Amino acid sequence: MSKNNDTTLLNEEIRFPEVRCLGDEGTQYGVVSSSEALKIAQDLGLDLVLIAPEAKPPVCKIMDYGKFRYQQEKKQKEAKKKQKQIEIKEIKLSVKIAQNDVNYKVKHAKEFLEEDKHVRFRVFLKGREMSEPQSGVEVLKRVWELVEDIAIMDKEPKPEGRYVNMTVIPKPKKVK
């Protein structure tokens, strides 16, 4: 019996009357009964693995299933390594922020953007500022003017609850 925990059918689990059988090195056994294909696999000391159940007739391959599963897991790990993790850095501002403080925060934002990180600017609205969220949008527009040379606006300044948020992403680097 099989020891697999995924959905791949092996050996006796394959219950189709006829299957197209392929060998490990590309040998073609043609269309044979599944019991005959299983016997060929057992004679070779390998497993019969169903690789295309939707085909007419279904396609089975004679191979070492342990080795096959190891290679599949290895491919998945490689694909996972190549996936790019998007990191979002958050910079908090207030409506009454001084221009020098804005410049300081923008300097940090530019460093993050140069490291290919996304940056979310957040203006916190306190008390009566909640009734006038447009002032927070204006602060973010001032910030945008300072970073637009190296960034692309991913999300426009928009009030969301007690905050006004804007997200910027780095401009794609030009390949020379």
UniProtKB/Swiss-Prot annotation:
GO molecular function terms noted in the UniProt entry: ribosome binding; translation initiation factor activity
Main localization (coarse): cytoplasm
InterPro entries documented for this protein: T_IF-3_C_sf, T_IF-3_N_sf, Translation_initiation_fac3_CS, Translation_initiation_fac_3, Translation_initiation_fac_3_C, Translation_initiation_fac_3_N
GO biological process, one term: ribosome disassembly
Domain of life assignment: Bacteria
One Gene Ontology cellular component annotation held by this UniProt entry: cytosol
PROSITE patterns: IF3
Subcellular location: Cytoplasm
Annotated TM spans: none
Keyword list, A-Z: Cytoplasm, Initiation factor, Protein biosynthesis
UniProt xrefs under PANTHER family: TRANSLATION INITIATION FACTOR IF-3, TRANSLATION INITIATION FACTOR IF-3, MITOCHONDRIAL
Function: IF-3 binds to the 30S ribosomal subunit and shifts the equilibrium between 70S ribosomes and their 50S and 30S subunits in favor of the free subunits, thus enhancing the availability of 30S subunits on which protein synthesis initiation begins.
Similarity comment text for this entry: Belongs to the IF-3 family.
Subunit architecture: Monomer.
Protein name: Translation initiation factor IF-3
